[in-house]
Design a protein with these regions (language model features):
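Sec-dependent N-terminal signal peptides
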Residues: 4-13
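Conserved positions within compact, well-structured domain cores
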Residues: 21-223
């Protein structure tokens, strides 16, 4: 009987340790991440850039900008000169601006990297598609904030608040849905890709780059 009790205690301690490793990992700056058990090994942050808790909306960023601001519009966007056909970076079409054929954000233009450090980045399209297709999405509420609970293959869950996006005015219907920037753009349109969710669930979509949207960092640890 004593041996059985000892085995049970050891097992419970091991499970507790495993749970802590899944849910409570953090870097030296206390930026926390969660292991959802995804095939790629991608680890997702537990909160948005600029947030103080998982349900906090955090800051809003135009694509390729690293600081929040009050107005999100073509006239305030860093990588154009005030019009759709005046792109100065991340452009593959001469009719849209200066061609450089860049389709992935440089680290200096990555809001996750600049605000959280070099081990963090904005997710790629592949990482977002993996989150969409490999996880279970469920509309939920955390501390009164609407959003989605995303449960990975290993049963671990993270929360994405429905923060919508910002433009040149106040946000209407906040809590209805969300849009999270990726690090990638097709280059041939004045929009970039990201993860969107709402009443219809989660999907990959494009949005004008100058819009202010949420950023959820990712990292991949060496195995």
């Amino acid at each position: 009987m004593k041996n059985l009790v000892l085995i049970m205690l050891v097992t419970m301690m091991a499970l507790s340790t495993e749970a802590n490793l899944i849910e409570n990992r953090s870097d030296s700056n206390d930026h926390r991440w969660i292991d959802l058990g995804l095939p790629s090994g991608t680890l997702w942050a537990t909160m948005n850039v600029g947030a103080s808790s998982p349900e906090d909306y955090g800051d809003y960023f135009a694509w390729g900008e690293t600081s929040p601001k009050e107005v999100y519009s073509l006239s305030t966007y860093k990588w154009c000169k005030g019009a759709e056909n005046t792109q100065t970076k991340y452009c593959s079409d001469s009719e849209l601006g200066i061609v450089d054929n860049k389709k992935t954000l440089d680290p200096d233009d990555d809001a996750a990297t600049i605000n959280w450090g070099p081990s963090w980045s904005m997710p790629t399209e592949a990482q977002m598609q993996e989150l969409i297709t490999r996880c279970n999405w469920k509309a939920s509420t955390m501390k009164g904030v609407k959003g989605y609970s995303v449960t990975g293959p290993n049963g671990a869950t993270m929360f994405l608040p429905a923060a919508l996006c910002r433009g040149d005015g106040p946000i209407d219907d906040i809590g209805w849905g969300g849009f999270y920037w990726s690090s990638e753009s097709p280059g041939f349109i004045d929009a970039s890709g990201g993860l969107t969710f709402g009443e219809a669930g989660a999907s990959w979509a494009f949005l004008y780059r100058f819009g202010g949207c949420s950023v959820r960092p990712v990292r991949v640890l060496n195995k």
